[in-house]
C-alpha cells in the first residue's frame, strides 16, 4: 500500500472495505459492491480499493461505469483544462478530476465514477 500511495500526485485514493458475498463492500459508503476475484476469501476480511484521481471522474449524466459513489465537494483546484475535485463520501476524502468547463461549486453533491480496470485491490496479501 505504501508504494500505491507514494507514487503519483495527487495520491491514490484508498477506500477501506471488506470482502463480501458480492465483491468488495466499501466501509460506510453508499456504493454498489465492487466485483472482485476474492470470492474464495472469507467474507468480512479487510481490503483496500485503490483508484487514482486520474481514473476517478465526476459524472454529469447516467453512466454504466462499474464504480459509482456519491460524494460532496469540499475543494475545487483549477489545473488548466481540468480541475481536481476534493470530495467527501462518508468519512473518506476522495480526489477526482473533471473538465474545467464544468460548473462545480463547493458543497455540490456529485457522483464519482471509474471503470473496472481502474480499480486496484490493495493489501490482498493480508486478506
Task: Identify what each model region corresponds to.
Residues 1-23:
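ABC transporter nucleotide-binding domain
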Residues 2, 56-58, 94:
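Short beta-strands and strand-coil junctions in structured, solvent-facing domains, enriched
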Residues 8-13, 43, 79-81:
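Short flexible coil/turn linkers enriched for glycine and charged/polar residues
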Residues 16, 22-75, 102-124:
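Glycine/charge-rich catalytic "coupling/switch" loops of P-loop NTPases
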Residues 23-24, 80-86:
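Short aromatic-glycine-enriched beta-strand elements
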Residues 29-33, 90-96:
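Short, structured beta-strand/loop micro-motifs enriched in basic residues and often containing a Trp
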Amino acid at each position: 500500500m505504501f508504494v500505491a500511495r507514494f507514487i503519483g500526485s495527487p495520491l491514490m485514493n484508498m477506500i477501506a472495505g471488506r470482502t463480501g458475498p458480492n465483491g468488495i463492500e466499501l466501509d460506510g459508503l453508499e456504493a454498489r459492491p465492487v466485483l472482485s476475484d476474492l470470492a474464495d476469501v472469507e467474507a468480512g476480511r479487510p481490503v483496500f480499493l485503490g483508484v487514482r484521481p486520474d481514473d476517478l471522474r465526476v459524472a454529469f449524466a447516467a453512466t454504466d461505469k462499474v464504480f459509482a459513489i456519491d460524494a460532496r465537494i469540499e475543494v475545487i483546484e483549477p489545473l488548466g483544462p481540468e480541475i481536481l475535485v476534493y470530495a467527501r463520501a462518508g468519512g473518506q476524502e476522495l480526489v477526482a478530476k473533471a473538465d474545467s468547463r464544468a460548473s462545480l461549486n463547493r458543497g455540490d453533491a456529485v457522483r464519482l465514477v471509474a471503470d473496472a480496470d481502474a480499480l486496484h485491490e490493495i493489501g490482498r496479501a493480508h486478506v
